[in-house]
């Protein structure tokens, strides 16, 4: 059959991957075994933004050195499940850092701030008068652009990433006229 473009993206915002990542990594390895084109994406640029999916507070800003050190730890841990000799490793700074302001605005036009603001943790932060940075609202669009840039057929991620992965589907459909799919693992 057709070889699919598949990816799993992880922002290196902590020193260790969590147990829930093992499920997604095992699924990725299964797809490697089936001969698909698999990318392990390191969200070094999106790690600078901070994902609101599971956070009540803004994430602390990491240095590029901290992000790189975390990536090394992630790869070492993930290699116990994923055969990296058959996987492409990419860093999303390769394309996100090249987007112009105009490019970013055009991407943002595909999304509604209302959809972002309706997410449970964002609603709670707003109700509690806690700061929600505008940069955080751009996070789903940037993760979605990862999917678009990699021309993915399937994106794998945890349940906490469903909203962000849907952004990739939106961009694939709106900008490429292509249906893409997500596999949601249960963490």
Predicted regions and their residues:
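A charged helix-plus-loop insertion that forms the helical arch/lid used to bind
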Residues: 52-68
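N-terminal catalytic cores of NTP/NDP-binding nucleotidyl/phosphoryl-transfer enzymes
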Residues: 2-52, 155-162, 168-169
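A general structural detector for well-ordered alpha-helical segments in enzyme core domains, enriched
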Residues: 24-27, 70, 74
């Amino acid at each position: 059959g057709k070889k699919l473009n598949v990816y799993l993206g992880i922002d290196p915002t902590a020193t260790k991957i969590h147990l829930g990542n093992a499920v997604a990594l095992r699924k990725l390895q299964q797809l490697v075994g089936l001969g698909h084109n698999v990318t392990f994406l390191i969200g070094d640029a999106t790690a600078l933004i901070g994902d609101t999916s599971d956070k009540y507070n803004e994430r602390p800003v990491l240095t590029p050195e901290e992000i790189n050190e975390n990536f090394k730890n992630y790869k070492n841990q993930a290699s116990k499940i994923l055969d990296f000799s058959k996987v492409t490793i990419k860093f999303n700074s390769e394309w996100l850092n090249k987007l112009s302001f105009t490019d970013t605005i055009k991407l943002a036009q595909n999304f509604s701030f209302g959809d972002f603001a309706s997410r449970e943790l964002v609603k709670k932060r707003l109700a509690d008068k806690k700061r929600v940075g505008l940069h955080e609202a751009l996070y789903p669009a940037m993760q979605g652009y990862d999917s678009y840039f990699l021309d993915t057929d399937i994106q794998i991620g945890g349940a906490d990433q469903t909203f962000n992965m849907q952004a990739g589907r939106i961009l694939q459909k709106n900008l490429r006229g292509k249906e893409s799919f997500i596999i949601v693992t249960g963490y």
